[in-house]
From Swiss-Prot:
<dbReference type="Pfam" id="PF02873">
    <property type="entry name" value="MurB_C"/>
</dbReference>
<dbReference type="InterPro" id="IPR003170">
    <property type="entry name" value="MurB"/>
</dbReference>
<dbReference type="GO" id="GO:0008762">
    <property type="term" value="F:UDP-N-acetylmuramate dehydrogenase activity"/>
</dbReference>
<feature type="domain" description="FAD-binding PCMH-type">
    <location>
        <begin position="27"/>
        <end position="206"/>
    </location>
</feature>
<dbReference type="InterPro" id="IPR016167">
    <property type="entry name" value="FAD-bd_PCMH_sub1"/>
</dbReference>
<feature type="active site" description="Proton donor">
    <location>
        <position position="220"/>
    </location>
</feature>
<dbReference type="GO" id="GO:0071555">
    <property type="term" value="P:cell wall organization"/>
</dbReference>
<dbReference type="InterPro" id="IPR036635">
    <property type="entry name" value="MurB_C_sf"/>
</dbReference>
<dbReference type="InterPro" id="IPR016169">
    <property type="entry name" value="FAD-bd_PCMH_sub2"/>
</dbReference>
<keyword id="KW-0573">Peptidoglycan synthesis</keyword>
<keyword id="KW-0274">FAD</keyword>
<keyword id="KW-0963">Cytoplasm</keyword>
<comment type="function">
    <text>Cell wall formation.</text>
</comment>
<keyword id="KW-0521">NADP</keyword>
<keyword id="KW-0285">Flavoprotein</keyword>
<protein>
    <recommendedName>
        <fullName>UDP-N-acetylenolpyruvoylglucosamine reductase</fullName>
        <ecNumber>1.3.1.98</ecNumber>
    </recommendedName>
</protein>
<dbReference type="InterPro" id="IPR036318">
    <property type="entry name" value="FAD-bd_PCMH-like_sf"/>
</dbReference>
Length: 298
């Protein structure tokens, strides 16, 4: 890896780190390397040392991610809690780094009397992950707020880009290859802080009432098909409670798969495949996974 060692970075660099403790499903084999930068400057310096072809996985809170049991080659860069600054730049503009949790961003905006980010309180991930997949909930989506992003690439190059440089759609974002989000500039609207905070509490009550928040899971497993809901289709096919090994379709919300305590990544992946096949056969609808699957089988 071009001479990179724990002694040459200020952050945390370890080899053969089991990813089960770094993902919200609590499954996954080892990463060849895991690096947690000390700060943004340390991250940029680290990227300068990397070979151009180094496989990279940027990790936030580990939601919406399935790491297979055989693990992943290359380097995992863990940014949650590191790139964690939020600033109000103008009356209606907020600048936020990619390692900030979506919930923290939503609460910050509400306290500042800014409206439009309340939906982010229900997304169990970081701003970086929300940017990468155009995450959404309760009718809102991340890129509706974005006015600019800051990105970095292999070699440590970093720059500012505008939304028109990306192709953004439902749960998909396509832009320049081998670049990753460092921060975003968001435009919101002025409003009442108390009303915004009440809205967040209402949305969280709604989420907590129907999602398995006390069990290891990764968020929604499948994208919603056009004009329908993946959870409704899965439930209509009688799949609530269906299980393979330690992975089970949640009885609270059919578009969630939970780890009952001893699941492997293979259990989760096989259950995802079986649910998709069953819905296709019974309902004639092809469900597309929202979960990002990486690594090799055991």
């Amino acid at each position: 890896m071009g001479g990179i060692s724990a002694a040459s970075v200020r952050g945390w660099l370890r080899h053969h780190v089991v990813m089960a403790s770094h993902t919200s499903w609590r499954v996954g084999g080892p990463a060849q390397r895991l690096y947690r930068p000390a700060d943004r400057d340390d991250l940029i310096a680290f990227l300068r040392f990397l070979p151009r072809n180094e496989p990279l996985l940027w990790l936030g809170l580990g939601s919406n991610l399935l790491v297979r049991d055989g693990g992943i080659s290359g380097t995992v860069i863990a940014i949650a809690g590191v790139l964690n600054r939020i600033e109000r730049r103008t009356d209606t503009t907020v600048w936020v780094e990619a390692g900030v949790s979506c919930a923290k961003l939503a609460k910050f905006c509400a306290r500042e009397g800014l409206r439009g980010a309340e939906f982010l309180a229900g997304i169990p991930g970081t701003v970086g992950g929300a940017l990468a997949m155009n995450a959404g909930a309760f009718g809102g989506t991340m890129w509706e707020l974005v006015t600019a992003v800051e990105v970095a690439g292999i070699g440590g190059e970093h720059c500012r880009r505008l939304p028109q440089e990306y192709q953004v759609s439902y749960r998909e974002v396509h832009g320049p290859e081998r670049e990753w989000f460092l921060a975003a500039e968001l435009r919101l609207t002025l409003g009442n802080s108390q009303v915004a905070q009440q809205q967040i509490r209402r949305l969280l009550r709604q989420r907590n009432g129907c999602q398995p928040i006390r069990q290891p899971c990764a968020g929604s497993v499948f994208r919603n098909p056009w004009n329908d809901k993946a959870g409704r289709l899965i439930e209509a096919c009688g799949l609530k409670g269906a299980s393979i090994g330690g992975a089970r379709v949640s009885e609270r919300h059919a578009n969630f798969i939970v780890n009952t305590g001893n699941a492997s990544a293979a259990d989760v992946e096989h259950l995802i495949q079986w649910v998709a096949e069953t819905v296709a056969r019974q309902a004639g609808v092809s469900l597309v996974p929202e979960v990002h699957m990486v690594g090799e089988p055991a």
